Amino acid sequence: MIPGEIIAASGDIELNAGAPTVTLEVSNTGDRPVQVGSHYHFAETNAGLSFDRAAAHGKRLDIPAGTAVRFEPGQTRSVTLIPLSGKREVYGFRQLVMGKL
């Protein structure tokens, strides 16, 4: 072993394995880009994003931790969402929940 060496196990790692998913079409109706991070409560994203917010309630993007998705002005794209896990409490963001989901 070399100091700092990483020895990874063989095989692939599947992110969020087994989590139920929902796919939504999202449009940026604003005139500025909007970037949404991996663990942001998607239903509370920027009001310039147009999508089914009720379907996004309690969900986050199905992307690796620490990454984000960017929506350019006028852009429409599909995103896959998974349920927030853990205690399923949401505080902050746009202050639409402020407690248990």
Swiss-Prot record:
Protein name listed in UniProt: Urease subunit beta
Any GO MF annotation of the entry: urease activity
Source organism: Rhizobium leguminosarum bv. trifolii (strain WSM2304)
Family recorded in the similarity comment: Belongs to the urease beta subunit family.
Biological process according to GO: urea catabolic process
Assembly information from the UniProt record: Heterotrimer of UreA (gamma), UreB (beta) and UreC (alpha) subunits. Three heterotrimers associate to form the active enzyme.
Compartments in which it is found: Cytoplasm
Enzyme type, top EC level: hydrolase
Protein keywords: Cytoplasm, Hydrolase
EC number: 3.5.1.5
Reactions this protein catalyses: urea + 2 H2O + H(+) = hydrogencarbonate + 2 NH4(+)
Annotated metabolic or biological route of this protein: Nitrogen metabolism; urea degradation; CO(2) and NH(3) from urea (urease route): step 1/1
GO cellular component: urease complex
Chief place of localization: cytoplasm
Signal peptide coordinates: none
